[in-house]
From Swiss-Prot:
This is LHFPL tetraspan subfamily member 4 protein. It is found in: Cell projection, Dendrite; Postsynaptic cell membrane. One of its GO terms (biological process) is neurotransmitter receptor localization to postsynaptic specialization membrane. It comes from Homo sapiens. The chain crosses the membrane at residues 22-42, 97-117, 127-147, 178-198. One of its GO terms (molecular function) is GABA receptor binding. Belongs to the LHFP family. Plays a role in the regulation of inhibitory synapse formation and function by being involved in maintening gamma-aminobutyric acid receptors (GABAARs) clustering and their associated scaffold proteins at inhibitory synaptic sites. Acts in concert with NLGN2 to recruit or stabilize GABAARs. The gene is LHFPL4. Keywords: Cell membrane, Cell projection, Membrane, Postsynaptic cell membrane, Synapse, Transmembrane, Transmembrane helix. Pfam families: L_HMGIC_fpl (PF10242). Interacts with GABA(A) receptor subunits. Identified in a complex of 720 kDa composed of LHFPL4, NLGN2, GABRA1, GABRB2, GABRG2 and GABRB3. Interacts with GABRB3. Interacts with GABRA2. Interacts with GABRG2. Interacts with GABRA1. Interacts with NLGN2; leading to mutual regulation of protein level and synaptic clustering. One of its GO terms (cellular component) is postsynaptic specialization.
Amino acid sequence: MLPSQEASKLYHEHYMRNSRAIGVLWAIFTICFAIINVVVFIQPYWVGDSVSTPKPGYFGLFHYCVGSGLAGRELTCRGSFTDFSTIPSSAFKAAAFFVLLSMVLILGCITCFSLFFFCNTATVYKICAWMQLLAALCLVLGCMIFPDGWDAETIRDMCGAKTGKYSLGDCSVRWAYILAIIGILNALILSFLAFVLGNRQTDLLQEELKPENKDFVGSTVSSVLRPGGDVSGWGVLPCPVAHSQGP
């Protein structure tokens, strides 16, 4: 084996070990993002009360709990994703739909992990990358649309008269909203990493095929050519030479 070929083989083996380790980390963080997505969809802690709010309570994408404003802290909870009429704002309905779509996409991406056993690795990485990118986009839309519903009457009663679209008044952003934003960054990084891994796998496959093709061509040529220089299966045709005749 030539020194260049040996160096290429060592590089390939080193890269494959690192690629597997990075792929495992990518899969683990993809599962973490799926958990984040499920949590932010279910939990009603996107926005909530503060010390100066007229009423206690908190809101999520579709479920919310609001108190009476009296001395007691008892909350009345309403809202269900299966019954859109109980969601206080059309913006909340749209945001809930996009976050749900993001959750479905990332769960579908995890399901695609099984394709690594049957399909080309580069293809699976690229499929997952597109699904993660779409999941991030849906989560971005959900986070952007959600504040458009802050002018709903139910939220204004809890957060005060200063509350309006993209203005929370006396209320504050809670941890689920912040977690959703972190999930967006996570999904974008995972998508970029999956594209890199997929493209690198494609490049390695092409590099592996090049020497195989060269060996195949070389063996074919050597088997076709005879030791005498004749081509097997082809007769050497005599070349007609024009003889000039004397006068």
